[in-house]
């Protein structure tokens, strides 16, 4: 299987993915091997069902939301490039990246892009704001039936009251960023990938 992974990924593809995502050559080849092992249809793409076979996602209360983040609107398959773009949001920021070229595109693992990614997990209807109902749905996914609907409603109301600065009873991206300004998002939204 290891040889299959390395023969199907060309060096120029690896270089393009490195440039776009910041992953190292060895990380890309290792993740490609993982990608091909998940690709049960052996067609070079992953389906939602392929992702649902990953135990860590299957038990994660936000697993479905995370899985959906891998897929473009209306798509039911993701190729390796799209898979890597999404994973790049979770790549830790290295010290040498903090002083990167300011004129280049913002890295996918920047604080801003990590916040946009997290915001989209809550913004279920993609209207660029988190409503009380959306917050309730995500809270319900996270806590299950361990908290009453009344308690969840109280948590959602208090969260929106504290975050909502413009009085529209919803949380905009700017308000979301403000609430999380003291949170180490770079660390909390990072997964260590082996080199």
UniProtKB/Swiss-Prot annotation:
Record carries keyword Repeat: yes
Membrane topology: Lipid-anchor
Full protein name: Calcineurin B homologous protein 1
Family: Belongs to the calcineurin regulatory subunit family. CHP subfamily.
Reported impact of residue 134 to A: Reduces SLC9A1/NHE1 stability and Na(+)/H(+) exchange activities
GO biological process, one term: positive regulation of protein targeting to membrane
Pfam families named in the record: EF-hand_7 (PF13499)
Oligomer and partners: Monomer.
SS bonds (residue pairs): none
UniProt cross-references to InterPro entries, sorted A to Z: Calcineurin_B_homologous, EF-hand-dom_pair, EF_Hand_1_Ca_BS, EF_hand_dom
Lipidation (N-myristoyl glycine): 2
Keywords attached to this entry: Calcium, Cell membrane, Cytoplasm, Cytoskeleton, Endoplasmic reticulum, Lipoprotein, Membrane, Metal-binding, Myristate, Nucleus, Phosphoprotein, Protein kinase inhibitor, Protein transport, Repeat, Transport
GO terms, molecular function: calcium ion binding; calcium-dependent protein binding; kinase binding; microtubule binding; protein kinase inhibitor activity
Sites where the protein binds Ca(2+) 1: 123, 125, 127, 129, 134
């Amino acid at each position: 299987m290891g040889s299959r992974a390395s023969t199907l990924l060309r060096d120029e593809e690896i270089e393009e993915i490195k440039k776009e995502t910041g992953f190292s050559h060895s990380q890309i080849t290792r993740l490609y091997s993982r990608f091909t092992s998940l690709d049960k249809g052996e067609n070079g793409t992953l389906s939602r069902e392929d992702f649902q076979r990953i135990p860590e996602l299957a038990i994660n209360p936000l697993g479905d939301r995370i899985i959906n983040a891998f897929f473009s609107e209306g798509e039911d398959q993701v190729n390796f490039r799209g898979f890597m773009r999404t994973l790049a949001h979770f790549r830790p920021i290295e010290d040498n990246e903090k002083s990167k070229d300011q004129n280049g595109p913002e890295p996918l693992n920047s604080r801003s892009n990590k916040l946009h990614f997290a915001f989209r997990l809550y913004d279920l209807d993609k209207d660029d704001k988190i409503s009380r109902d959306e917050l309730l749905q995500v809270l319900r996914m996270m806590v299950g039936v361990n908290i009453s609907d009344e308690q969840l409603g109280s948590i959602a109301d208090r969260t929106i009251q504290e975050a909502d600065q413009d009085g529209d009873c919803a949380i905009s991206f700017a308000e979301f960023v403000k609430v999380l300004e003291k949170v180490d998002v770079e660390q909390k939204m990072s997964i260590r990938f082996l080199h």
